[in-house]
Amino acid sequence: MTRVKTVMTNENNKYDFIFKGINLTKSIFIVGLVIRLVLIVFAEWQDANMLVKYTDIDYVVYTDASRAVVNGLSPYDRSTYRYTPLLAYLLVPNILIHPAFGKLLFVICDMIIAYLLKGILLERFPKITSRTLLICLASWLLNPFSINVSTRGNAESVIGAMVLASFYFLTKKNLTLASIFYGLSVHFKIYPIIYSIPMYLYIDENFFSRKPSEYTSLNNNFKNIFKNFFNKNRLKFFLISAFTFISLTFIMYLIYGYIFLFETYLYHVIRADNRHNFSVYFYQIYLNTPIVETVGDLVGKVNGSNMIVALASFLPQVILLLAITLVYFNDLEFCLLLETITFVAFNKVCTVQYFIWYYSILPLVIPSSSLGLVQYIILFAVWMGSQGLWFYSAFNLEFLGLQTFWNIWVAGLLFFIANIYILVKLILNHNPIKVNQYLKSK
């Protein structure tokens, strides 16, 4: 009978799965890295030789913004650059060294995410089996979406690494670094602000004495939430993360002015995407003129109907996010996953890059789920299948010039239903008792 190996925690928190003399844990890191590097090289060839480019248009925007910085100009001189200037600074080597530098940076962030996932899993589930750990890591490192998004030159892995770094340092009881990385992640992209309340509640007055493996939703006590709402640990997290965000934002504002605030943050509140959008609000957005594209358009060009959509779309998000937080904040990884899926599914703009937001968290909930590998595959098939009609309709629109906007909207509705179905399945199969079975050894 084969003996099931479990995590043998040592000072380095190393745990490797060995199969027939092969270290599969290390191998999967190597394979994931090699696949990404090969695709970066392939992208150079395809971009030079084929009509359809492999590289994402966003990467061209990043690079143009970095070129502006090198030339002493503002990154916002490049139209459609709607990110923090820090991203343009990071990609200056695109201009000075090689245009593919940024893709390599994003791939490195992919690998950092995998490292952080492993560290969090070992802290959170001390008795996790080596097979389960391997599956968790493979679900990120071999995920075709994470591979594609980074190698095409989208920066979502940078933000994902920051969010997971914050969670990682929470499990390591380093509240200062956790706060800094969280504030940095919100500065880079505003969406991690949805994690603020669950993270705040997770840091209770016993934060430094409780092991990461002792937190489950079975321990939720709503009376204690308000009784110790302003404990010193929570206030430290709030003050340091707020200082990090505000100081970086203020510095960028001093350098670039209002255009920085608008393009980096305000634009995303009123953004309307009438083409590459899975959202259930897509058709309403299509039927109305996009809200605004530049700062100069802001005055007098905000369409009233789209503004209503922009504001109304936040209401179901806020209600659901608060409900999820109150129920699951002690199962922080599960809470963050549910919040991310909910936020993306109900958002007025939903694109492929957003999927990385929850794919980088998904591996953390696999050990506490009653779903088996086959069930996960079925859910993935449902999720992918629901996108088939959307991609078909989008292809007809983009490449054949057919008017398929209504078809795209219907496909978006099916995709929304698929996301809700997956969300319900995850909730029904989340097992706090199973979590406890992983916890008692440390």
From Swiss-Prot:
<keyword id="KW-0472">Membrane</keyword>
<dbReference type="GO" id="GO:1990529">
    <property type="term" value="C:glycosylphosphatidylinositol-mannosyltransferase I complex"/>
</dbReference>
<keyword id="KW-0337">GPI-anchor biosynthesis</keyword>
<keyword id="KW-0328">Glycosyltransferase</keyword>
<feature type="transmembrane region" description="Helical">
    <location>
        <begin position="242"/>
        <end position="262"/>
    </location>
</feature>
<dbReference type="GO" id="GO:0006506">
    <property type="term" value="P:GPI anchor biosynthetic process"/>
</dbReference>
<dbReference type="GO" id="GO:0000030">
    <property type="term" value="F:mannosyltransferase activity"/>
</dbReference>
<keyword id="KW-0256">Endoplasmic reticulum</keyword>
<feature type="transmembrane region" description="Helical">
    <location>
        <begin position="408"/>
        <end position="428"/>
    </location>
</feature>
<feature type="transmembrane region" description="Helical">
    <location>
        <begin position="22"/>
        <end position="42"/>
    </location>
</feature>
<comment type="similarity">
    <text>Belongs to the PIGM family.</text>
</comment>
<feature type="transmembrane region" description="Helical">
    <location>
        <begin position="307"/>
        <end position="327"/>
    </location>
</feature>
<keyword id="KW-0812">Transmembrane</keyword>
<dbReference type="GO" id="GO:0004376">
    <property type="term" value="F:glycolipid mannosyltransferase activity"/>
</dbReference>
<protein>
    <recommendedName>
        <fullName>GPI mannosyltransferase 1</fullName>
        <ecNumber>2.4.1.-</ecNumber>
    </recommendedName>
</protein>
<comment type="function">
    <text>Mannosyltransferase involved in glycosylphosphatidylinositol-anchor biosynthesis. Transfers the first alpha-1,4-mannose to GlcN-acyl-PI during GPI precursor assembly.</text>
</comment>
<dbReference type="InterPro" id="IPR007704">
    <property type="entry name" value="PIG-M"/>
</dbReference>
<keyword id="KW-0808">Transferase</keyword>
<keyword id="KW-1133">Transmembrane helix</keyword>
<feature type="transmembrane region" description="Helical">
    <location>
        <begin position="95"/>
        <end position="115"/>
    </location>
</feature>
<feature type="transmembrane region" description="Helical">
    <location>
        <begin position="336"/>
        <end position="356"/>
    </location>
</feature>
<dbReference type="GO" id="GO:0051751">
    <property type="term" value="F:alpha-1,4-mannosyltransferase activity"/>
</dbReference>
<feature type="transmembrane region" description="Helical">
    <location>
        <begin position="177"/>
        <end position="197"/>
    </location>
</feature>
<comment type="pathway">
    <text>Glycolipid biosynthesis; glycosylphosphatidylinositol-anchor biosynthesis.</text>
</comment>
<feature type="transmembrane region" description="Helical">
    <location>
        <begin position="361"/>
        <end position="381"/>
    </location>
</feature>
<dbReference type="Pfam" id="PF05007">
    <property type="entry name" value="Mannosyl_trans"/>
</dbReference>
<dbReference type="GO" id="GO:0005789">
    <property type="term" value="C:endoplasmic reticulum membrane"/>
</dbReference>
